[in-house]
């Protein structure tokens, strides 16, 4: 991840596993990383869009093993890094080590466990290190300096900067607070920093990259397309068009940053 990248988020199994695989292949063209969300019945950090996608996947009989199968299939054609996003409950129920091994065997590059605080993640981090599984932790605009440093050190792939307070979901604009947070993280952190929550336009990606982000994480806006177009050729066209717009925004932001 040298040049800034698009991190594209999809909910695994929405609306079905075969569609997820097609969506991943479509987004792969413009994505430096793909984040694959494992549906969960109580996704507290996610807004209505991703919650609804989780419900769609779960109501169609989704099982965690399906995420691993989809990833294995994707791996046959692409070496783009895939980060699995989940909540702690499914990992705990399966057993942390079993989950990490399954994810590794499927071809995952790293894991995000949204609701696992860093101070409670010692065992998880040790297991990930043992199996060479990457870790991604989150930081918010009010994260103190020292915790930001520790979170950065604990994140082997990138640190996930939450652009604003609250839940995921598309927004129209970003506040100065977000840009200040990126600059602060850029100064404090040694590793990569990617910004997520609320990115829904190429211009958003442009401004966030210009401020110093190494990547933008886009989820709800992609999931909205899937909600509207389902498992269809039109969905693939719309996903690709939007990914292209975001990618172009990233490139523009990077050019501005380097002027």
Curated annotation (Swiss-Prot):
Kindly state which reaction or reactions the protein catalyses. Answer: (1S,2R)-1-C-(indol-3-yl)glycerol 3-phosphate + L-serine = D-glyceraldehyde 3-phosphate + L-tryptophan + H2O
Q: Which GO terms describe its molecular function?
A: tryptophan synthase activity
Q: Which UniProt keywords apply?
A: Amino-acid biosynthesis, Aromatic amino acid biosynthesis, Lyase, Tryptophan biosynthesis
Record flagged with keyword Translocase? no
E.C. no: 4.2.1.20
Which Pfam families does this one have?
Answer: Trp_syntA
Question: What is the active site of this protein?
Answer: 35 (proton acceptor), 46 (proton acceptor)
- Copy the pathway line from the protein's UniProt record: Amino-acid biosynthesis; L-tryptophan biosynthesis; L-tryptophan from chorismate: step 5/5
Q: Name one GO cellular component term.
A: cytosol
Output the InterPro entries linked to this UniProt entry.
Answer: Aldolase_TIM, RibuloseP-bd_barrel, Trp_synthase_alpha_AS, Trp_synthase_suA
**SUBUNIT field:** Tetramer of two alpha and two beta chains.
What is the protein's known function?
A: The alpha subunit is responsible for the aldol cleavage of indoleglycerol phosphate to indole and glyceraldehyde 3-phosphate.
Q: Which family does it belong to?
A: Belongs to the TrpA family.
Q: Report what the protein is called.
A: Tryptophan synthase alpha chain
């Amino acid at each position: 991840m040298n040049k800034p990248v698009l991190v594209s988020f999809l909910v695994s199994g929405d609306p079905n596993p075969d569609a997820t695989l097609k969506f991943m292949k479509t987004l792969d063209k413009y994505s430096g990383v793909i984040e694959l969300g494992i549906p969960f019945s109580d996704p507290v950090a996610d807004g209505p869009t991703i919650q609804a996608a989780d419900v769609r996947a779960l109501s169609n009989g989704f099982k965690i093993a399906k995420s691993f199968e989809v990833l294995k299939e994707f791996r046959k054609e692409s070496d783009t890094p895939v980060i699995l996003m989940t909540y702690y409950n499914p990992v705990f129920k399966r057993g942390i080590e079993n989950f990490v091994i399954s994810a590794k065997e499927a071809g995952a590059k790293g894991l995000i466990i949204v609701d696992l605080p860093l101070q409670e993640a010692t065992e998880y981090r040790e297991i990930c290190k043992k199996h060479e599984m990457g870790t991604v932790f989150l930081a918010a605009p009010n994260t103190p300096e020292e915790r930001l440093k520790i979170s950065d050190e604990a994140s082997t792939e990138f640190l996930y900067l939450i652009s604003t307070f609250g839940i995921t979901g598309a927004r129209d604009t970003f506040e100065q607070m977000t840009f200040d947070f990126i600059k602060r993280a850029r100064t404090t952190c040694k590793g990569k920093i990617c910004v997520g929550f609320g990115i829904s336009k190429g211009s958003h990606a442009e401004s966030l990259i210009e401020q110093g982000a190494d990547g933008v994480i886009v989820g709800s806006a992609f999931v909205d397309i899937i909600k509207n177009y389902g498992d269809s050729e039109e969905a693939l066209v719309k996903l690709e068009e939007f990914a292209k717009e975001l990618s172009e925004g990233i490139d523009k932001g990077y050019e501005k940053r380097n002027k």
